[in-house]
Amino acid sequence: MKDTSLPSTAGVVNKLIDSLGKLPGIGPKSAQRLAFYLMRAPEDQVISLSDTIRNIKNQISQCRICCNVADSELCPICQNTKRETNKICVVEQPQDILALEHVGVYRGYYHVLHGAISPTEGITSQNIRINELMVRLDNGQVEEIILATNPTTEGEATAMYLSRLITPLGIKVTRLARGLPFGTELEYADDVTLSRAMEGRQNF
């Protein structure tokens, strides 16, 4: 990683710049701007931010049903009894739910795998939340599984694996339409593309 420290800046500021620069999507210049913004910001705002970051580690866990992030036993989506109980959309990461919810065309529930099958990285089906998904299918309420894993080599491998597991159960398995460019992560797709991919999903 490129050194973001500034020789003319106090050590504690350089430490902050370095820490911010380790965040995804934050380059050296952005890290410096954020650091100096925090220096100028009101103390209560900085303390509130610090407390919130600390609470993420202390208070956030996983929903016992869908494995989404939650600050109680169930995430807000699983608490919502007005959603369609016969559909589950399977995604790789919690941020994929945010992207799909922002589009607003899907009203079923979700399941978060927290990863994708990747033999090159040593990630197998046992390392992601597939067993938890299969348990959810035992109640006979689910009629459709929507595979919304990323259009990557790992995402496709995971989708194929899940399809082979679920199809024999008599549950309809669909995949997001091919509007997403290969190699794209779901969270970075624009709303129009995601909407078309969800509405045009195909049997898989």
Swiss-Prot record:
Pfam families: RecR_C, RecR_HhH, RecR_ZnF, Toprim_4
UniProt keyword list: DNA damage, DNA recombination, DNA repair, Metal-binding, Zinc, Zinc-finger
Domain Toprim, residue spans: 86-181
One GO-annotated biological process of the protein: DNA recombination
Chain ranges of zinc fingers (C4-type): 63-78
A molecular function (GO) term: DNA binding
SUPFAM superfamilies hit by this protein: Recombination protein RecR
PANTHER family: RECOMBINATION PROTEIN RECR
HAMAP family found in the cross-reference section: RecR
Function: May play a role in DNA repair. It seems to be involved in an RecBC-independent recombinational process of DNA repair. It may act with RecF and RecO.
Stated family: Belongs to the RecR family.
Protein name according to UniProt: Recombination protein RecR
Organism: Dehalococcoides mccartyi (strain ATCC BAA-2100 / JCM 16839 / KCTC 5957 / BAV1)
